[in-house]
Amino acid sequence: MQDLINYFLNYPEALKKLKNKEACLIGFDVQETETIIKAYNDYYLADPITRQWGD
């Protein structure tokens, strides 16, 4: 997941296309892609002190 976050940070236009459903991640269907984007948003928008991935 960290690799995906780094990719989104380096290529924000790719994230924009994913959010607009103009693209999807290879190997993931649209629903899985939406789940990944939600996880990214939840992580990225979280307070840096409380940022952590699930156990």
Swiss-Prot record:
Give the superkingdom in one word. Bacteria
Which organism is this entry from? Bacillus subtilis (strain 168)
* Protein's recorded name: ComX pheromone
Q: Where is the lipid attached (3'-farnesyl-2',N2-cyclotryptophan)?
A: W53
Keyword annotations from UniProtKB, A to Z: Competence, Lipoprotein, Pheromone, Prenylation, Secreted, Sporulation
Q: Its biological function?
A: Part of a major quorum-sensing system that regulates the development of genetic competence. Acts through the activation of the two-component regulatory system ComP/ComA composed of a sensor histidine kinase, ComP, and a response regulator, ComA. Activation of ComA leads to the direct regulation of over 20 genes and expression of over 150 additional genes, including those involved in competence development, appears to be controlled indirectly. Under certain conditions plays a role in sporulation.
Other remarks in the entry: The DNA sequences encoding comQ, comX and the N-terminal two-thirds of comP show a striking polymorphism, which determines the specificity of the quorum-sensing system in the different pherotypes of Bacillus. In ComX, the sole conserved residue is the modified tryptophan essential for the activity.
| CC terms in the record's Gene Ontology section | extracellular region
**Post-translational modification summary for this protein:** Trp-53 is modified by farnesylation, which is essential for activity. Modified by the tryptophan prenyltransferase ComQ before export to the extracellular environment. The type of isoprenyl derivative differs among the different pherotypes and depends on ComX primary sequence.
Q: Where in the cell is it found?
A: Secreted
Q: Which GO terms describe its molecular function?
A: pheromone activity
Propeptide residues, chain positions: 1-45
Q: From which residue to which does any coiled coil extend?
A: none
Q: How does it assemble?
A: Interacts directly with the sensor histidine kinase ComP and stimulates its activity.
Q: What is its main location?
A: secreted
One GO biological process from the UniProt record? establishment of competence for transformation
Swapping D47A leads to an effect described as: Induction of srfA is delayed approximately 1 generation
